[in-house]
Amino acid sequence: MSTGGQAQIGNVDLVKQLNGAAVYRLIDQQGPISRIQIAELSQLAPASVTKITRQLLERGLIKEVDQQASTGGRRAISIVSETRHFHTVAVRLGRHDATITLYDMSGKSLGEEHYPLPERTQETLENALFIAIAQFIENYQRKLRELIAIAVILPGLVDPALGVVRYMPHISVNNWALVDNLKQRFNVTSFVGHDIRSLALAEHYFGATRDCEDSILVRLHRGTGAGIIVNGQIFLGNNGNVGEIGHIQIDPLGERCHCGNFGCLETVAANAAIEHRVRQLLTQGYPSKLTLDDCSISAICKAANRGDLLASEVIEHVGRYLGKAVAIAINLFNPQKVVIAGEITEAEKVLLPAIQSCINTQVLKDFRKNLPVVTSELNHRSAIGAFALAKRAMLNGVLLQRLLES
């Protein structure tokens, strides 16, 4: 009997969370909006909408605003979300450093700092990371109204449901319970996610894919990875890790990849691989304005934009191989838009046509029809993916319900 009662209580809590999320989502994404409009769009009873909006108002999560009636008569009362008073500490943990940014709930950055983290063990990295977060919070104490979440994104394999880091490319981790440890240290709701998957979600909320529900983001940096959005949600699969596009084999006779295979996309389309190819060609005597002392990815992109033949050839070469992998992904997922992210997009006028050429010849006609291939709008906001995890938790009701109950 007790089991049935507990299940019933659980179901009631879930319904409360889902209904609250439905109302908050409409206010956040379509506000100013009236209670009548919320009831119509959510298909909730007007009494339920009134109750939920009262709770949100009392908690300070929404506010009422006057809107001029279309008839010119009495002003109608509408509702918008209150974004200024609730803050998230968003962390992008890299291989050697951390970028920490303070966001309000609109996605506005209130401050950002960079911290070197050269540690090489799980324990020392966690200790240094937590010291950096504590220092950051102390530095921004005057701007902080209410800290509602800490979110961390990182490269590697992550179990977002359990909040556990399974693998990182540069240090050995053993089921690193990062979320539980953050909660214990800072006493605030915490999240962890994969950096590129989270960036794809951020692009959906704030960037180039706001206007579509299905998209693919491919980012080139130290490695090459993808984030896939399906029906407005990150596609994660059973264990939370999907999108290793960098390990699609595009050249069976190619270089050996760190994963152990040969000819992975990452051996061609990652910053280090691009820089290495340019150095090889320069050493072989190919003419270019680039020099061995200055052939960073940024310098290569600038040279390509200026028409440097060697730089342009290298970027086009990357684009063709990247295009092959992107074409495979398009045929699998049929997205509404493809986004390319990373420093290489500085040479988008050279890169994108090479990718598009592959799409035109290797993707089903119906799938490539009216399919935009664009560059990321969030390239210079490295921690925005972490904030997207907190935003999602507000929109799906998980974090929202905790705030209403606190």
Go through the PLM ranges and name each one.
Residues 88-92, 147-151, 215-219, 225-227:
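Short glycine-aspartate micro-motif
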Residues 109-214, 350-361:
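Glycine-rich phosphate-binding loop and adjoining helix at the ATP-binding site
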Residues 104, 160, 229:
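Short, acidic, Ser/Thr-enriched surface-loop or helix-capping motifs
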Residues 96-98, 157-159, 225:
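Short, acidic Gly/Pro/Ser/Thr-rich loop/turn segments
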Residues 1-67, 71-146, 253, 265-406:
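ATP-binding/phosphotransfer module of carbohydrate and carboxylate kinases, centering on a glycine-rich
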Residues 112-114, 120-125, 174, 181-309:
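Glycine/GP-enriched mid-protein hinge/lid loop-to-helix segment characteristic of carbohydrate kinases
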Residues 155-158, 222-223, 344:
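Short glycine-rich anion-binding loops that position phosphate/pyrophosphate groups of nucleotides
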